[in-house]
Amino acid sequence: MAQQADQQTVTDSTPELPTTIKELADLLDIPLVDCLVPCNFCGKFLDFLEVCDFDKKQLTLIWKGHFVTACCRSCCAATAIYEFNEFYQQTVLGRDIELATGKSIFDLKIRCQTCLSFLDTIEKLDSCGRGLPFHKVRDRWKGICRQCKHLYLNNDR
């Protein structure tokens, strides 16, 4: 009993680990530009643009004990491709996503199938208007963001 009480006290007093690189930098009281975080997959340290990109995409830091990793831009793309190839479920075109989900396009969280960033409202509406596909992968919806759209549309020529 006493051991359980001690264990619970330690657990209760353990601070919650940061989930973003910005939160990590704030916790360490260092500038974001000085925050060096390795990629979980390739081991390369993320450069400043990748750090900003990681947080913009609302990705979550991976903690293994007290060791933290993130995901670089190249590995994000590789992960997106892997997930699509291994866990693809279905495709709907344009506004049909609302019929498939029973939700408004405004209420859906959709990540880019290529870079994993969240699509904003304009990107989702653009995909609906153009009749572009939305893919269900691992029970989550994927579309195409404005950055990756140019690659996607140029490949159709």
UniProtKB/Swiss-Prot annotation:
Domain of life (superkingdom): Viruses
unnamed zinc finger span: 39-75, 112-148
Keywords: Activator, DNA-binding, Early protein, Host cytoplasm, Host nucleus, Host-virus interaction, Inhibition of host innate immune response by virus, Metal-binding, Modulation of host cell apoptosis by virus, Transcription, Transcription regulation, Viral immunoevasion, Zinc, Zinc-finger
GO CC annotation: host cell cytoplasm; host cell nucleus
GO BP annotations listed: DNA-templated transcription; regulation of DNA-templated transcription; symbiont-mediated perturbation of host apoptosis; symbiont-mediated perturbation of host ubiquitin-like protein modification; symbiont-mediated suppression of host innate immune response; symbiont-mediated suppression of host type I interferon-mediated signaling pathway
UniProt xrefs under InterPro entries: E6 (IPR001334), E6_sf (IPR038575)
Gene Ontology terms, MF aspect: DNA binding; zinc ion binding
Keyword presence, Metal-binding: yes
Subcellular location, record wording: Host cytoplasm; Host nucleus
Assembly behavior: Forms homodimers. Interacts with ubiquitin-protein ligase UBE3A/E6-AP; this interaction stimulates UBE3A ubiquitin activity. Interacts with host BAK1.
UniProt similarity note: Belongs to the papillomaviridae E6 protein family.
Function comment: Plays a major role in the induction and maintenance of cellular transformation. E6 associates with host UBE3A/E6-AP ubiquitin-protein ligase and modulates its activity. Protects host keratinocytes from apoptosis by mediating the degradation of host BAK1. May also inhibit host immune response.
Protein name: Protein E6
Native source species: Human papillomavirus 12
